[in-house]
Amino acid sequence: MTKKKVKVGTNTIALNKRARHDYFIEDEMEAGLELQGWEVKSMRAGKANISDSYIIFKQGEAYLFGATIQPLNVASTHIVCDPTRTRKLLLKQKELASLFGKANRDGYTIVALSLYWKGAWAKLKIGLAKGKKQHDKREDIKEREWKVTKDRIMKNARLG
């Protein structure tokens, strides 16, 4: 019996760290992406950015808007490579209906959280989010600073 090969490295292509700072993430979901060949090659080279991207709905379908995938220099010359084109998300009808309803009725925003490989497929983790106010962001910063201070105090108490 042959052993499975252990993969070295990470499966993450791009992260949207700003999303967790600007929004309360209520729910997360995984979606596939409809990509062109040059986009897959660029993503394998790590040329993707989803920091300012979000999900829009058009004609009952969900699309990733604002994501940038820079084409490689060796990309095909007979295809026009648009780095900021809107890309269709591959979701089940039930998931689409749920997201659409919450975004329209309840005032949620749907943001892209991370882009990663799952096997040979590129997947996008999307989050159902509510916007944070300025005071919420300040509270998060205070909590983070208090945690660091508390850990420092506990470490000094253990050592001395």
Swiss-Prot record:
Compartments, record wording: Cytoplasm
Keyword Ribosomal protein in annotation: no
Family designation: Belongs to the SmpB family.
Keywords: Cytoplasm, RNA-binding
Molecular-function annotations in GO: RNA binding
SUPFAM superfamilies per record: Small protein B (SmpB) (SSF74982)
Name of the molecule in the record: SsrA-binding protein
Entry's Gene Ontology BP terms: trans-translation
Coiled-coil regions, chain positions: none
Domain of life of the organism encoding this protein: Bacteria
NCBIfam families xref list: PRK05422.1, smpB
Gene3D superfamilies: 2.40.280.10
Keyword Cytoplasm: yes
Its biological purpose: Required for rescue of stalled ribosomes mediated by trans-translation. Binds to transfer-messenger RNA (tmRNA), required for stable association of tmRNA with ribosomes. tmRNA and SmpB together mimic tRNA shape, replacing the anticodon stem-loop with SmpB. tmRNA is encoded by the ssrA gene; the 2 termini fold to resemble tRNA(Ala) and it encodes a 'tag peptide', a short internal open reading frame. During trans-translation Ala-aminoacylated tmRNA acts like a tRNA, entering the A-site of stalled ribosomes, displacing the stalled mRNA.
A Pfam family recorded for this sequence: SmpB
Species of provenance: Pasteurella multocida (strain Pm70)
One Gene Ontology CC term in the entry: cytosol
